[in-house]
C-alpha cells in the first residue's frame, strides 16, 4: 500500500493510510487472524454475518419502497 507524503505532512499521510487500510479490510483481517478460530465457530460466525447482511438488505429495500421510515440523521457538533 502506498501513500504520498506532500509537504512533509505526515499527519495527513497517516490519516490517508488508515483510511485506505480500513477500506481494504486490513484491520478486520488482522483481528481475525490474531487468534485461531475453530471451524465450528467460523461456521457460526459466517452464518450470523449472512443473516445480518440479508436483514440489512431487506431493511434497505423496504426503506427504498417507502414502507419503512428512513433513519434520522443526527447532527454532531464538531
UniProtKB/Swiss-Prot annotation:
<dbReference type="GO" id="GO:0006412">
    <property type="term" value="P:translation"/>
</dbReference>
<feature type="region of interest" description="Disordered">
    <location>
        <begin position="58"/>
        <end position="78"/>
    </location>
</feature>
<keyword id="KW-0687">Ribonucleoprotein</keyword>
<comment type="similarity">
    <text>Belongs to the bacterial ribosomal protein bS21 family.</text>
</comment>
<dbReference type="InterPro" id="IPR001911">
    <property type="entry name" value="Ribosomal_bS21"/>
</dbReference>
<dbReference type="Pfam" id="PF01165">
    <property type="entry name" value="Ribosomal_S21"/>
</dbReference>
<dbReference type="GO" id="GO:0005840">
    <property type="term" value="C:ribosome"/>
</dbReference>
<dbReference type="InterPro" id="IPR038380">
    <property type="entry name" value="Ribosomal_bS21_sf"/>
</dbReference>
<keyword id="KW-0689">Ribosomal protein</keyword>
<protein>
    <recommendedName>
        <fullName>Small ribosomal subunit protein bS21A</fullName>
    </recommendedName>
</protein>
<dbReference type="GO" id="GO:0003735">
    <property type="term" value="F:structural constituent of ribosome"/>
</dbReference>
<dbReference type="GO" id="GO:1990904">
    <property type="term" value="C:ribonucleoprotein complex"/>
</dbReference>
Amino acid at each position: 500500500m502506498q501513500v504520498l507524503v506532500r509537504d512533509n505532512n505526515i499527519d495527513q499521510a497517516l490519516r490517508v493510510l488508515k483510511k485506505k487500510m480500513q477500506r481494504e479490510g486490513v484491520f478486520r483481517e488482522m483481528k481475525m487472524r490474531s487468534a485461531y478460530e475453530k471451524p465450528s465457530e467460523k461456521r457460526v460466525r459466517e452464518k450470523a454475518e449472512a443473516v445480518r447482511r440479508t436483514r440489512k438488505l431487506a431493511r434497505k429495500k423496504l426503506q427504498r419502497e417507502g414502507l419503512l421510515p428512513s433513519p434520522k440523521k443526527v447532527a454532531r457538533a464538531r
